[in-house]
Amino acid sequence: MDIQFLGTGAGQPSKARNVSSLALKLLDEINEVWLFDCGEGTQNRILETTIRPRKVSKIFITHLHGDHIFGLPGFLSSRAFQANEEQTDLEIYGPQGIKSFVLTSLRVSGSRLPYRIHFHEFDQDSLGKILETDKFTVYAEELDHTIFCVGYRVMQKDLEGTLDAEKLKAAGVPFGPLFGKIKNGQDLVLEDGTEIKAADYISAPRPGKIITILGDTRKTDASVRLAVNADVLVHESTYGKGDEKIARNHGHSTNMQAAQVAVEAGAKRLLLNHISARFLSKDISKLKKDAATIFENVHVVKDLEEVEI
């Protein structure tokens, strides 16, 4: 499980940073990629990665500001041109209006897609659990921005316990099909009469990962709730230390406020993105250094960076 950042800039693209988008790569878990936001130029960034557009099965939009959605028509169209690959349907989750934006863009441009898009729109009254599969659950909660905006909490369901092969060998169980039966929870009796209780050779279930991905927001309790015990918290950092007033006026957060959210939520790691173009390289180092005085395990991400979860 990895996150690859396709756009880490704020508001408009710069030479160093494209506008908002990231890919949650779940290839080992479910052979899918989930995209969060799709700012202008996202498809160009994808060309610089190993991501195959057909693997993108779901797109989650945080809000309808242009720097988070203007890349959708282009990406959706390019996804249709995957030579020799089976076309697969796509799901888009987002605030009310995202369906109208996508369909209008495709209609006006005369674009026809060989796959179906299934839209899941929500508003303030229809948040909470928005998706559940056999391996993941996704929650959405409203944040505090200048327009309706949400954050997402992706929870991987608990993983099966692992089989203790060495302990089985010591008990006289020959390697082979019996291992598979025990792994599936089946109790056995060996030829010599030894009883093998599967539960004695399988570890307890392992807790799944929690990934929190926030849209643009002021500091708010909703961010903390979404990030409780998160393995990774992706939080915007449009402004730096001392800019709390201007950040609030524009519906954004500082690096220090993001760090405070991480502390209050008990998150394990904080990844700062949505970085303003006014921050030069030396300023990026300061963003991290200042935030680390509050929450030590912090990192300022850059375009195309990949983070293992």
From Swiss-Prot:
UniProt-annotated binding residues for Zn(2+) 2: 67-68, 216, 274
Enzyme superclass (EC): hydrolase
Required cofactor(s): Zn(2+)
Textual note on the cofactor: Binds 2 Zn(2+) ions.
Cited function: Zinc phosphodiesterase, which displays some tRNA 3'-processing endonuclease activity. Probably involved in tRNA maturation, by removing a 3'-trailer from precursor tRNA.
Taxonomy of the source species: Bacteria, Bacillati, Bacillota, Bacilli, Lactobacillales
Top-level division of the source organism's lineage: Bacteria
Chemical reaction(s) catalysed: Endonucleolytic cleavage of RNA, removing extra 3' nucleotides from tRNA precursor, generating 3' termini of tRNAs. A 3'-hydroxy group is left at the tRNA terminus and a 5'-phosphoryl group is left at the trailer molecule
Keyword check for Nuclease: yes
Descriptive protein name: Ribonuclease Z
HAMAP family: RNase_Z_BN
